């Protein structure tokens, strides 16, 4: 669901078309598991079987350790005003477990994953990491996302897994960001920690940006110049700092 914006490790989420659906209506007039159904949910125009969850949500069947981590992630997301929604399976294409939309600052997870605590937590970590990527790219107030881990921090098996999942699906441009999120989803507590850093405005200190992302952040005024980046010139390609319409 992303398209390549520049060659520096940033991307934009594709904008879904607005659907003429009455708020609160279910998707009986839309095909189950279709992109139209997904878009209707993302726009919060189809809300039957969809609920927003907060830190006080009770995860039935989760062991305390997993429930605690899930709650920490949701607490941090609440702090930066990113909504987390559980949606009926019919809203999701069959290949999709969850999705984060940086242009709306909300993400959605399939309801049936609640029956699989490990799968749910993994998806929550993964989509939460896309929120961290959003924060890395100048904050969640814009729709850019940037890779968080440096390439040498991501194991080769993770890169191979991302290539298998997304390359074969024709989404090769998304592989760097998806490998980034897959690696985070395999680490206990990492997403919660990074989201808390985002909320506390310490993300760049705790997770130094990649060199090209750092250069872009400074050029666009999202980050103060330092070290070899000073003195610097304002980004000459101002269109790289402004979301495409």
PLM feature spans:
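Auxiliary, metal-adjacent structural segments of Zn-dependent hydrolase domains
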Residues: 22, 32-103
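Metalloprotease/metallohydrolase-associated module, dominated by Zn2+-dependent proteases
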Residues: 80, 144-245
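Catalytic Zn2+-binding segment of zinc metalloproteases
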Residues: 128-146
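Short pre-active-site segment immediately N-terminal to the catalytic Zn-binding motif
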Residues: 107-124
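A mature extracytoplasmic/lumenal domain signature
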Residues: 88-90, 111-113, 135-138
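Positively charged n-region of N-terminal signal peptides that target proteins for export
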Residues: 1-4
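Stable alpha-helical elements in mature extracytoplasmic
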Residues: 69-73, 120, 124-128, 177-180, ...
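Bacterial N-terminal signal peptides
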Residues: 7-17
């Amino acid at each position: 669901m992303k398209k390549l914006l520049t060659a520096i490790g940033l991307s934009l989420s594709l904008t879904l078309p607005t659907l003429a659906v009455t708020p609160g209506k279910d998707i009986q007039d839309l095909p189950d598991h279709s992109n139209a159904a997904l878009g209707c949910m993302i726009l919060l125009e189809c809300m039957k079987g969809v609920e927003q969850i907060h830190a006080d949500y009770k995860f039935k069947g989760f062991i305390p350790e997993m429930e605690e981590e899930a709650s920490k992630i949701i607490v941090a997301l609440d702090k930066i005003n990113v909504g987390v929604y559980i949606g009926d399976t019919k809203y999701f294409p069959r290949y999709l477990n969850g999705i984060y939309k940086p242009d709306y600052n909300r993400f959605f997870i399939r309801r049936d994953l609640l029956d699989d605590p490990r799968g749910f937590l993994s998806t929550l970590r993964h989509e939460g990491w896309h929120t961290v990527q959003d924060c890395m790219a100048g904050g969640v107030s814009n729709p850019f996302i940037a890779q968080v881990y440096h390439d040498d921090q991501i194991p080769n098996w993770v890169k191979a897994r991302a290539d298998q999942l997304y390359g074969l699906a024709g989404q090769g441009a998304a592989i760097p960001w998806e490998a980034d999120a897959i690696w985070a989803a395999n680490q206990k507590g990492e997403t919660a920690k990074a989201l808390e850093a985002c909320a506390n405005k310490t993300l760049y200190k705790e997770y130094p940006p990649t060199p090209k992302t750092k250069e872009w952040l400074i050029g666009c005024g999202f980050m103060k110049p330092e070290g070899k980046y000073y003195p610097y010139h304002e980004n000459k390609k101002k269109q790289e700092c402004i979301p495409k319409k």
